[in-house]
Design a protein with these regions (language model features):
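Short, well-ordered amphipathic alpha-helical segments that serve as non-catalytic structural scaffolds
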Residues: 2-3, 109-123, 197-202
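Short acidic capping loops at alpha-helix termini that bridge into adjacent secondary structure
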Residues: 15-16, 126-131, 155
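Acyl-CoA/ACP chain-elongation machinery
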Residues: 21, 25-35, 96-100, 140-145, ...
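Glycine-rich, mobile lid/loop segments that gate access to catalytic sites or pores
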Residues: 1-54
Length: 240
């Protein structure tokens, strides 16, 4: 209901919602590990089986097995490793309410807004400094909410922003470049894969690499979207 309310208030169309899945697939198309790689169109999405209105099958995350791991250590210790280290520039976390039914408004995520603001403040950077973005996408609306609640676009603008190709390969803000939960994988604890893709991008070793990524913003979500965590990664050592 929250998504339908958002669409009514902002004028976001079903075609724009479907564009999220189309954009993710353009990224996963060149990712060998991705579960779904064949390119799709908006019509393909809208003609796929309805799961729960307004979400069609291709607007819902995959169900897969999988796992991942990261090594977290000091910057000094990381210099001893064979691979170039990636640094955590900023962090943030927020829980709006313990029960999703108690959210003040389901047409946006207060937790997204709070956690991302904390991360930007800690990192000391602006939105224009971010080269790459990962937003948890269990369903197609979450990248739309994320773009707005993180402050990359204004409320009601995210659908058109994605539809116009701005988050797709060659766009001004590459997003969910592995294919995300809609096309790459979704094991239930998908946040691990968000972080891994951010790290691979800033290292320059991603399967579908974005040129010259120096800063990646990674946004996770929990409890529908009443809870959130934000991380900002960089390949340059933070100033002490």
């Amino acid at each position: 209901m929250g998504v339908l309310r958002y669409m009514k208030e902002t004028g976001t169309t079903h075609e724009q919602l479907a564009s999220v899945a189309v954009a993710q697939r353009k990224w996963s198309n060149k990712v060998p590990r991705a579960m779904m790689r064949d390119l799709i169109t908006v019509d393909d999405v809208l003609n796929s089986r309805m799961i729960c209105y307004p979400f069609h099958l291709l607007e819902c995350c995959l169900v897969t097995d999988g796992g991942g791991a990261l090594i977290l250590t000091s910057a000094e210790r990381a210099n001893d490793f064979s691979k170039k280290p990636v640094y955590i520039l900023g962090t943030g976390e927020s829980v709006e309410t313990p029960i999703v039914s108690q959210m003040y408004d389901m047409t946006y995520s207060t937790a997204f807004r709070v956690s991302s603001r904390q991360a930007f403040e800690e990192a000391g950077i602006k939105h224009k400094d971010v080269n790459h973005l990962m937003i948890y996408d269990a369903f197609a609306h979450l990248p739309i909410y994320g773009l707005e609640d993180l402050g990359f676009v204004k409320r009601g603008e995210a659908g058109a922003f994605i539809e116009e190709g701005n988050t797709s390969p060659g766009g001004k803000l590459p997003m969910d470049t592995s294919g995300g939960g809609l096309s790459y994988t979704h094991t239930g604890a998908y946040g691990m894969f968000l972080m891994q893709e951010s790290i691979r991008q800033v290292r320059g070793e991603a399967a579908h690499q974005v040129p010259d990524v120096k800063v990646s913003f990674c946004q996770g979500v929990g409890g529908m979207f009443m809870a959130a965590g934000s991380l900002i990664f960089t390949n340059e050592p933070p100033h002490s």
